Amino acid sequence: MTTSGCNPMKSSSTSNPTIGFVSLGCPKNLVDSERILTQLRMEGYNIVPSYNDADMVIVNTCGFIDSAVQESLGAIGEALNENGKVLVTGCLGAKKDEIIQVHPNVLGITGAHAYEEVLAQVHEHLPPSQTHNPFTDLVPPQGIKLTPRHYAYLKISEGCNHSCSFCIIPDMRGKLVSRPIGQVMGEAERLVKAGVKELLVISQDTSAYGVDIKHRTDFWDGRPLKTDMYQLAAALGELGVWVRLHYVYPYPHVDNVIPLMAQGKVLPYLDIPFQHASPTLLRKMRRPGQVEKTLERIKNWREQVPNLTLRSTFIVGFPGETEADFEELLGFLEEAQLDRVGCFQYSPVEGAKANELPDPVLDEIKQARYDRFMQLQQRISTERLKQKVGQTLPVLIDEVDDEGAIGRSYADAPEIDGCVYLNGDIQVKPGDIVNVQIEHSDEYDLWGTRV
C-alpha cells in the first residue's frame, strides 16, 4: 500500500474503526491529506499502513497532467482490489464521470480540499466508534504530519486566479481563497513549537496571497498584519526557523521580499515558474511576457543577495513553438544562470485551452529540444554549484545511516533539489543544522565535512 505516512498516530484502542490512506501529487495535496488525517484521528479513527488492516481506504488523487490521472486511477484500482471499500478525493475528483467509468464501485467521490465532504462520507460508510476517548486518542497541537518532524509545508491559500492555457488547476481547485494571516501565523507557531526547523510556504500562487480579500488586515501576537506575501514573509522570519518561498508568480511586488533575504529573515531562495522565454509562446501560454524586464530583475535581485538561489520550471514543445522560440529559451537560460531548473515536454491536458492551439510540435522534436535544454542547464547548474566549493554552508540534516548523513543547504528544497552529503559523519541527527565545508560538487549535489 502506497502512503505518504504509514502510521501517523495509531491509537491504543483496538475497537476504533481503521482507515488506510493513499496520498498522491504535490505538497499542496499532502497538506490536504494531513488535515483530513488529523480530523479523523481526533474522531478516534485509527490510521493503518496496510490494506488488510483497513476497514476503508481513502485515495487523495492528483489530476494535473495525464500521467498523474493514470497514476491516480491505478491507485484507486489497487485499493479496490486489495480492500474493496474506497473513497476518492483530491483534484481528480473534479472528473467524477471519468473515475466512475473506470471504477464504478467506489463508495464516494469528492473534489480537492473538500474536507467536510470527505468526513461526511467516512461517517456514512464507517461511523466513528461510540467508545472513542479523546484523552487516550491524543493528537498533537500541530496535527498529523506526513513530512519528517523537522520540516513542514505551510499552505497559505487555495485555488488560483490565473488562466494559463496549459493548466486546469482553477477548474479543479477553484479561484484564489487566501487564509487569514493570523490563522497562518498561528499554525506556523505551533509547528515551530513542535520542533519544525524549516517552513515551506506553498500555494498555487504565493505572490497573489491576499489579493482575493483585498489584503485585509488581521491580527497576530496582538498586532495588525496585512494579508500579503511581504508581511507574511516578514512575520515568519521572526520565528527563528528557515522560511522557504515556493510557487511565486513573477509579479513586480516580489521585489519587496528580496531585502528580507538580504537581512537573513527568509532563505535566499525563490521558486518562480517562468515556463518559457519567447514572448510569442508566453502570450499563447497566457503568461507574463516581459522577458527583458525579468532578466533585469534577476540581475537586481542578485546584486542585493549574491547567494540567491533561483529555481524555475519550463515547458518545451508547446503548440506553435518554433526553432527560433526555442533558441530564445536557450538564450534566456544562458543569461539568467538559474540554479535549479525543471523541464517538461508539453503534453495535452484534458480540458486545457492549449489543446485548441494549432501547430502541435512533433514528439521527436520535443524530445530533441528537451535533451538540448537539459544539457545546457546541467552545464549551468554544474558551474554554479562548483562556486560553492570551499564555502562553509549551514546544512539541515534530513537522514543519517551507517554511511553518513544527508542534508540540504538553503539552496535545496526537499524532494525537488539537490542534497549535501556528509560521508562517514554519523554524529548528527535529523533536524540538526550544522556548518559544512563544501569540498566537492557535481551538477546536482554537494559533498562536504562538518566544521
Swiss-Prot record:
Residue sites binding [4Fe-4S] cluster 2 per the record: C160, C164, C167
Molecular function GO terms recorded: 4 iron, 4 sulfur cluster binding; aspartic acid methylthiotransferase activity; metal ion binding; protein methylthiotransferase activity
Pfam families, per database record: Radical_SAM (PF04055), TRAM_2 (PF18693), UPF0004 (PF00919)
Domain of life: Bacteria
Keyword vocabulary terms for this entry: 4Fe-4S, Cytoplasm, Iron, Iron-sulfur, Metal-binding, S-adenosyl-L-methionine, Transferase
Residues in Radical SAM core domain copies: 146-383
Major enzyme class: transferase
Disulfide feature: none
Start and end residues of each TRAM domain: 386-451
SMART domains xref list: Elp3
Domain MTTase N-terminal, residue spans: 17-127
Catalytic activity annotation: L-aspartate(89)-[ribosomal protein uS12]-hydrogen + (sulfur carrier)-SH + AH2 + 2 S-adenosyl-L-methionine = 3-methylsulfanyl-L-aspartate(89)-[ribosomal protein uS12]-hydrogen + (sulfur carrier)-H + 5'-deoxyadenosine + L-methionine + A + S-adenosyl-L-homocysteine + 2 H(+)
Main location: cytoplasm
Cofactor: how bound: Binds 2 [4Fe-4S] clusters. One cluster is coordinated with 3 cysteines and an exchangeable S-adenosyl-L-methionine.
GO CC annotations on file: cytosol
Cofactor: [4Fe-4S] cluster
Binding site for [4Fe-4S] cluster 1: C26, C62, C91
Localization in the cell: Cytoplasm
Enzyme Commission (EC) number: 2.8.4.4
InterPro entries tied to this protein: Elp3/MiaA/NifB-like_rSAM (IPR006638), Methylthiotransferase (IPR005839), Methylthiotransferase_CS (IPR020612), Methylthiotransferase_N (IPR013848), Methylthiotransferase_N_sf (IPR038135), NA-bd_OB-fold (IPR012340), Ribosomal_uS12_MeSTrfase_RimO (IPR005840), rSAM (IPR007197)
Protein family per UniProt: Belongs to the methylthiotransferase family. RimO subfamily.
Protein name stated in the entry: Ribosomal protein uS12 methylthiotransferase RimO
Organism: Cellvibrio japonicus (strain Ueda107)
